[in-house]
Amino acid sequence: MSVISMKQLLEAGVHFGHQTRRWNPKMKPYIFTERNGIHVIDLQKTVKLVDDAYNYVKNASQEGAVVLFVGTKKQAAEAVKEEALRAGQYYVNHRWLGGMLTNWNTIQTRVTRLKEINKMEEEGTFEVLPKKEVVLLNKERERLEKFIGGIADMPRIPDVMYIVDPHAEQIAVKEAKTLGIPVVAMVDTNADPEPIDVVIPANDDAIRAVKLITAKMADAIIEGRQGEDAADDFVAEEAASEESLEELAEIVEGK
C-alpha cells in the first residue's frame, strides 16, 4: 500500500504544473496532460515515486543518516523548518549561501561565532556590556541565525538532501553533486530532473503541496529511526491509489 493517496495529492494541488511555455522537456515522462495552458502532472507516477522516496529516506534514516531539508522560497520555508525539526534533522530555509557545503570549514567558523554569542548571553555577559554593543551582538546573531541557524548543530556534511524546487535551489544541487550527496527533491514541470537522484514530480509552488510531501519525508525519517508505528503517516487505501487516468482527467477538467 502507498504512503500517500491520489485524493491527498489532488486536494493539495500537487498535480498543477507550470505554464506549458515554461516547461522543461525532460519532465515529459511525468506529465499527464495539458489543461488551459497548464501542464498537469501524472499523479499515478507521483504516488509511486513518493513511495520510492519514502523508502529511500527511511532506509537512510535506519542507517543513521544526517538529512538536510532545503527550501528557501516563501511557499516552502515554514514547512521545511517545521518538518526538519519534527524529524530531528536540519534545514536551510532562508537563502543558500554559496559554499555552504563545499566550504564547510568556513561555514563552521560562522557557526562557532553564533554559538559564542549565545553563550555570552547565557553566561550573563550581555548584562555587563554597553547597551550599544549588546544591540550589535543581537543583530549579528539574528543574521547568523537566519542563514545558518538550521545547520548550527548539524554534526557533519549531510548524507542525504531533500530539496523543494531544485530549479530555485540550483546552487545547493550543484554542491550536493560535487560532494556526492544524494538528492531527493520535489520537481515541478519547469525543472531539470536529471541531477536529482530521487525525483518526486509535484507542484512545488503551493504551500499545501509542499507541506504534504515534506511531511511524508519527515515521517520516513521518524519511521526509520523509531519503527513503523512512530511516524504519524497516512497509509493510502489500495483503491485510492488505483484511480485510473480517466478519473484523474475528469477531476482535472472539473477544476
Curated annotation (Swiss-Prot):
Keywords per UniProt: Ribonucleoprotein, Ribosomal protein
Annotated region (Disordered), positions in chain: 233-255
Annotated Gene Ontology cellular component terms: cytosolic small ribosomal subunit
GO molecular function: structural constituent of ribosome
Claim: Ribonucleoprotein is one of the keywords in the record: yes
Annotated GO biological process: translation
Alphabetical list of Pfam families matching this protein: Ribosomal_S2 (PF00318)
Gene3D superfamilies: Glucose-6-phosphate isomerase like protein, domain 1, Helix hairpin bin
Family in the record: Belongs to the universal ribosomal protein uS2 family.
Annotated protein name in UniProt: Small ribosomal subunit protein uS2
Annotated organism of origin: Lactococcus lactis subsp. lactis (strain IL1403) (Streptococcus lactis)
Annotated gene: rpsB
